[in-house]
From Swiss-Prot:
Organism encoding this protein: Nostoc sp. (strain PCC 7120 / SAG 25.82 / UTEX 2576)
GO terms for MF: FMN binding; metal ion binding; oxidoreductase activity, acting on the CH-NH group of donors, NAD or NADP as acceptor
InterPro entries documented for this protein: Flavin_Rdtase-like_dom, Flavodoxin/NO_synth, Flavoprotein-like_sf, Metallo-B-lactamas, NADH_oxidoreductase_modular, ODP_dom, RibonucZ/Hydroxyglut_hydro, Split_barrel_FMN-bd
Binding site for Fe cation 1: H97, E99, H164, D183
Gene that produces this protein: dfa1
Protein name, UniProt field: Putative diflavin flavoprotein A 1
């Protein structure tokens, strides 16, 4: 288990790239492509620690390559593979799923090994035919089927659709006990340690990855866990981050517990998208992340591959529906839309968005049909006319939060009304100041009215803020992010409070009509605030329905030394 090779290249545009090869078991080599400086992986991930793209080579009597890598590693990766083995002798390329960060070099491998057989789910093979635009030998596999490489390497395939692509399969080697999982159980974390020895260093990234990619498909996670429960797993060979070996039972147990908690909710939102069309899947995942922040369950389903009965059952169960427009020329997707229209019921929540594929089903006629059937629009249609910017992605996440909050409004009202216990009344006597948190990350700005704020340390100077998991600003308050804590003045807070407490439409400018000036990091400072401090988030603690955000304070200023901070007096402790 020693690093055999390590090659590096640096590029001003993409940062430092490293390829590391490690023998992880008998006749099995990991090819880890380390992307040290990547700072962003869609809106879900503001990366603190880069990421990796992991590929694997199994040398039995026959040879199999499990996944490839991101196209940015083309030169390094192909040189490493050629150094390990003559590519023309590779018999099989197993494609766990067709997301470009793992299948980006499939076409290059085909050029080096034209007789190779590509192994994957039926949907994956179909997607690849549209990606590589050349004929290739293929083998479609289903759950429970095996591929014998010889020398004891019997590979068993496990179907895991919607984790987080519809074509996902897992691969288990019965000789080595290695389960190849691609995105499942992964994390965006880049370092030169092959395995998960440092549990606490990667724990937060593991949870964040689950929340963003796997949580929206909790039911599918549970189904996959059920299928692998009888496998004697010694190593989980993930597609991103360190391989899991030291703490396997803990990681898998957390996936199960998180998914059980997510799946047991009574409120379900069905998210329909068209795989491999426009930005459909990308935007729906972001929107689904916004939904799950409010405590509702979500289920993603591909309009191009789902069976009519599957669509009908999901629509019947769901309290809300979100549809990313498929191509108007896809007969399968059109049939799925007709099934949805026939299965919806009165007062379901509905949200529609374009996919930006150039041939989208027109959104407004479909919107009218749903309204005629008595469905309630959760957010205005989201129109996509160009490649989604950060602001568009923020709009989608906030739209997801909106539909989730609308569906859980009765639960929230019930909680507010349950104020009979002495404990809640006593807790409500804890008074705090009034503040507005403002932040900016790239093109995105956010703001939040807050009262659960306190100084938390003297050396270094630090503050702690409780942020509800369903707040829109939560995605902008990750470790390493910056924000401004604006302190409101006792006799001059009503206008700002009224403005920032109002309900904003998804993507709306929180600062329209408000005078601000930029902090050091660009976050807005409110001109009418009594005082402000510029803060950097250094840790987050999971506290039930809130995050406790601890931040160090770097800059501060008081506008009026004679004024007092506005104070928030409550009588009950079960709501703000």
């Amino acid at each position: 288990m020693v690093a055999l090779t390590e090659d590096t290249q640096a590029n001003a545009n993409i940062g430092r790239l490293t390829v590391q090869t490690v023998e992880i078991a008998d006749e099995t080599t990991a090819i880890r492509c380390l992307d040290w400086d990547r700072e962003r992986f869609d809106i879900e991930f503001g990366l603190r620690n880069g990421t990796t793209y992991n590929s694997f080579l199994i040398k039995g009597e026959k040879i199999a390559l499990v996944d490839t890598s991101h196209r940015k590693f083309e030169k390094l990766y192909l040189e490493i593979v050629a150094g390990l083995i003559d590519p023309n002798t590779i018999d099989y390329l197993i494609v766990s799923h067709t997301e470009p960060d793992h299948s980006g070099l499939v076409k290059d491998i085909l050029q080096l090994a034209p007789n190779i057989t590509i192994v994957g789910a039926k949907v994956a093979i179909q997607f690849l035919e549209n990606m590589v635009h050349q004929p290739f030998k293929s083998l479609q596999v289903k759950s429970g089927e095996r591929l014998d490489l010889g020398n004891g390497h019997s590979l068993e395939f496990v179907s895991a659709p919607n984790l987080h692509w519809p074509d996902t399969i897992l691969t288990y080697d019965h000789k080595t006990g290695i389960l190849y999982t691609c995105d499942v159980f992964g994390m965006h974390y880049c370092d030169d340690q092959t395995y998960d020895e440092n549990f606490f260093a990667i724990e937060e990234d593991f949870k964040y990855y689950y929340d963003c990619l796997m949580g929206p498909n909790a039911r599918s996670v549970l189904a996959a866990l059920k299928r692998i429960e009888n496998l004697a797993i010694k190593t989980v060979a993930t597609g991103h981050g360190p391989l899991l070996q030291v703490h396997i039972s803990e990681w898998l147990g957390r996936y199960k517990n998180w998914s059980l908690e997510q799946a047991k909710t009574e409120t379900l939102v069905a998210l329909f998208y068209a795989e491999d069309y426009g930005y459909s899947e990308h935007l729906v995942h972001i929107l689904g992340h916004g939904c799950t922040k409010t405590g509702v369950a979500v289920e993603l389903i591909d309009l191009n591959t789902a069976e009519p009965q599957e669509v009908r059952e999901l629509v019947t169960q769901a309290s809300g529906l979100v549809i990313a427009m498929p191509s108007q020329y896809s007969l399968t997707a059109q049939a799925a839309l007709n099934t949805i229209l026939a299965a919806v019921h009165h007062k379901q929540a509905i949200g529609l968005l374009e996919s930006g594929g150039g041939e989208d089903e027109p959104v407004f006629p479909l919107r009218n049909k749903f309204q005629e059937l008595g469905l309630v629009e959760a957010f205005p249609p989201i129109l996509i006319k160009e490649a989604p910017a950060q602001t568009t992605e923020q709009l989608c996440e906030e739209a997801g939060t909106d539909i989730g909050q609308w569906l859980t409004r009765d639960r929230t009202i019930k909680q507010i009304k349950s104020i009979n216990t002495d404990l809640e009344k006593a807790l409500g006597r804890i008074s705090t100041g009034l503040y507005i948190i403002t932040t900016k990350k790239g093109e995105i700005q956010g703001a939040m009215f807050a009262s659960w704020v306190t100084q938390a340390s003297l050396n270094p100077l630090g503050v702690a803020i409780a942020v509800s998991k369903e707040r829109a600003i939560e995605s902008l308050m990750q470790v390493g992010d910056h924000f401004v804590l604006n302190v409101l003045e006792e006799d001059n807070y009503q206008g700002l409070m009224k403005h920032f407490l109002k309900r904003f439409a998804p993507g709306a400018d929180r600062f329209a009509g408000i005078k601000t000036y930029p902090a050091t990091d660009g976050s807005p400072i409110l001109a009418e605030s009594l005082a402000y401090t510029e803060c950097e988030i250094t840790s987050r603690m999971d506290c039930g329905d809130h995050w406790i955000i601890y931040s160090t304070v770097h800059v501060g200023r008081v506008a009026n030394v004679h004024a007092m901070t506005a104070v928030h007096h409550r009588k009950v402790g079960n709501h703000y």
